[in-house]
Swiss-Prot record:
Summary of the function given for this chain in its UniProt record: This protein is located at the 30S-50S ribosomal subunit interface and may play a role in the structure and function of the aminoacyl-tRNA binding site.
Family: Belongs to the bacterial ribosomal protein bL19 family.
Any GO BP annotation: translation
A single Gene Ontology CC term: cytosolic large ribosomal subunit
PROSITE patterns cross-referenced by the UniProt entry: RIBOSOMAL_L19
Record flagged with keyword Metal-binding: no
Record PANTHER family: LARGE RIBOSOMAL SUBUNIT PROTEIN BL19M, RIBOSOMAL PROTEIN L19
The entry's keywords: Ribonucleoprotein, Ribosomal protein
GO MF terms held by the record: structural constituent of ribosome
HAMAP family linked to this entry: Ribosomal_bL19 (MF_00402)
Gene this chain is encoded by: rplS
Matches recorded under InterPro entries: Ribosomal_bL19 (IPR001857), Ribosomal_bL19_CS (IPR018257), Ribosomal_bL19_sf (IPR038657), Translation_prot_SH3-like_sf (IPR008991)
Top-level taxon of origin: Bacteria
Name the UniProt record assigns to this protein: Large ribosomal subunit protein bL19
Amino acid sequence: MNLIAKLEQEEIERALAGKTIPEFAPGDTVIVSVNVVEGNRKRVQAYEGVVIAKRNRGLNSSFIVRKISSGEGVERTFQTYSPLLASIVVKRRGDVRRAKLYYLRERSGKSARIKEKLVSKDRAAQA
């Protein structure tokens, strides 16, 4: 392992101190809690939507979450190991056949729905 990879691994471990990032994939509905600083106040803001893309690049990993707010599509990119992320909760697993769901940008209503992934009894017993 070269020096840069070691430094990145140390930074990832430092960013994850006390936090756990769940396994999630494109198509999953997640609730991302973000620490927001307004003046001298600090609060947690929840952002719920569908993961349409995930980018695995070590310390530079990120994911894009899309939601519909007031009839308008809103996308937000989150850095996976950012200190501003308070927590990530997977609300629902989606069953998709693509890694990038950018086609959802052109769709609205029923055509933008994602099927729910059914968990087999074997997996449910393990979890």
